[in-house]
Amino acid sequence: MKPKDIVAQFVADIQAQRFDEAKALLVTDGFEYVGPNMRFVNPDDLMAYQFGMVAIQKALILRQLSAEEEQVFAILDYRTNFEPIGDVRLAVWFSVLGDKIQKVEAFYNAAVVENMLGGNLPSAS
């Protein structure tokens, strides 16, 4: 698969709550997720966080997907069942190495997510 297809499949797997399939698209060594208020260096930690968000996830809408070689950029709408927050727009940059995602950099309004989690963010360690 091309990098763009790998990322599209990853997003589809997260939306459908197929976390084992999504995790299989991530490298095991050298993985990194960086967001404005959290960081994961282990795919298991990212998947545990995603699993924890299932209760509020209404939909994950892929609005745009662009790629240049192994770099893939996605615009997503994270729709929630948590009415005080509503939807969160995300810009996500993926670096693909071979047939796996090596790095995920997410950009979004961190204050919204922090409020949604009641100020309890996962540890960055």
Task: Show which residues each predicted segment covers.
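C-terminal and inter-domain tail/linker signature
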Residues: M1-S125
